[in-house]
Amino acid sequence: MCSSDLGPLALHWAAVSRGQRGTDWNTHCAQLAQLPDGQLWRAHQAGDLPRAADGRATLDPVKLGQLVRANMGKRGFTYTHWKDAESIQWVRHANQWGFRVNLSADSIEEVDTLMAHQAGPVVVVLPPDARENFRTPGGHRVVICPATQREDITCASCQLCQRERDTVIGFPAHGT
């Protein structure tokens, strides 16, 4: 179950669905463009990059382009489960233009597959007791998310997910 289905995040998203919070895509991108240069920000606390406008099971390249444009000079990042060939191509472009899109692997084996695309950084969810860095069967280094390991490190102070990197970030599963 996704963490956005429970607790405070679920309450927030219910209000968004009722139209009590949030805004439309174009306004959202315009607001992001107004952030100061160099500003670190994360997109999509829950959910994913938008689906193609024609309903195909691929990300929407126009909306991704708007997000990339809004991010110019900033340090935005997100995560995606869009892994079809077309999406991989657009993720590669977004990363080349400085909007960091982390490809989310569903298994250690998939890490190696996604890394082979060379479209951008990769992350993976690990068992809850994962504490040691390791290498995948394909030899890719997986580093346990520092913010999950030390109380004095936060996403804002670490910033590893926003960096261009060859290292995979592993997130130990948590919650219910």
Name these PLM-found stretches.
Residues G22-Q149:
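Conserved AdoMet/S-adenosylmethionine-binding subsite of the radical SAM
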